[in-house]
Amino acid sequence: MNTQTRETTSMSDAQDKAATLIEALPWIQRFAGTTMVIKYGGNAMVNDELRRAFAEDIVFLHHVGIHPVVVHGGGPQINSMLGRLGIESEFKGGLRVTTPEAMDVVRMVLTGQVGRELVGLINSHGPYAVGMSGEDGGLLRAVRTGTVVDGEDVDLGLVGEVVGVDPAGIVDILDAGRIPVISTVAPEIVDGGDSVPGAARFQPTGQVLNVNADTAAAAVASALGASKLVILTDVEGLYANWPDKSSLISSLTASELRDMLPRLESGMIPKMAACLKAIDEGVERAHIVDGRLAHSMLLETFTTAGIGTQVVPDEETNA
């Protein structure tokens, strides 16, 4: 006769897992039926184990009744492809200059490589994900932007800022029970001036722009009335006194972030500005989460303590 026994340690582990599930229950109940926008980026995009874990997290959100919308960039993959094609990357003030030649690569990599791979990973769990880009169905609209270096205006080429979102295409995919996966390129529009009435004032140029995935995700979250914006990055969260790791901020209000923003490290400014924009435009919560940790998004969303940094409206200081 075969006898099976369970060690005390394994039973303790099982009880810990049960406790984690019970802890998640009120958060699942709270966010079921809401839309969550997740910006996918950083190391989570290039590490195979983390990529698989991210896809599992998205499918988990889907199955507990949350409507995930994934927005992604692809900086590492773009750099790799430009190198393989012998196209030199130019940077001004730390920002990439996107030439027409480089823009062709950006579109190819974001929509044809990164987006397709992520859709495939999610769909390995079932027919859930649908890929789209900011060009599809007039989803995103952008204006060309530059930057200032040492007091001088600098042209960054085909780089833009999202100024409009038509969420109808995303809503159609969500209503069909699917998961939208959005790559961040956007058609360029120009302002015809006050003399042009109504919607005709903003005209497409036929050009496509490379847009920042953090700010694009914030714009999409605002347009959808999302309950959460989650930005995956390569740090644990926002620090009050970087690089002091003990100064990690677990939660702060929009006003507190607004005061801190000018003093932040340059790499964190676009991410935290995106969080602030989302909160200012009605998103309930915005989170910065360490994408180097597998399943970090679930830990931040479904545990009481969380592991990253959340930004909340001024009138609500408690999570």
Curated annotation (Swiss-Prot):
Binding annotation for substrate: 74-75, 96, 210
Keyword Kinase: yes
One GO cellular component term noted in the UniProt record for this chain: cytoplasm
One example of a Gene Ontology biological process annotation: arginine biosynthetic process via ornithine
EC primary class: transferase
Protein family according to the UniProt entry: Belongs to the acetylglutamate kinase family. ArgB subfamily.
Function, as annotated: Catalyzes the ATP-dependent phosphorylation of N-acetyl-L-glutamate.
NCBIfam families linked to this entry: argB
Name of the protein described by the UniProt record: Acetylglutamate kinase
Organism: Pseudarthrobacter chlorophenolicus (strain ATCC 700700 / DSM 12829 / CIP 107037 / JCM 12360 / KCTC 9906 / NCIMB 13794 / A6) (Arthrobacter chlorophenolicus)
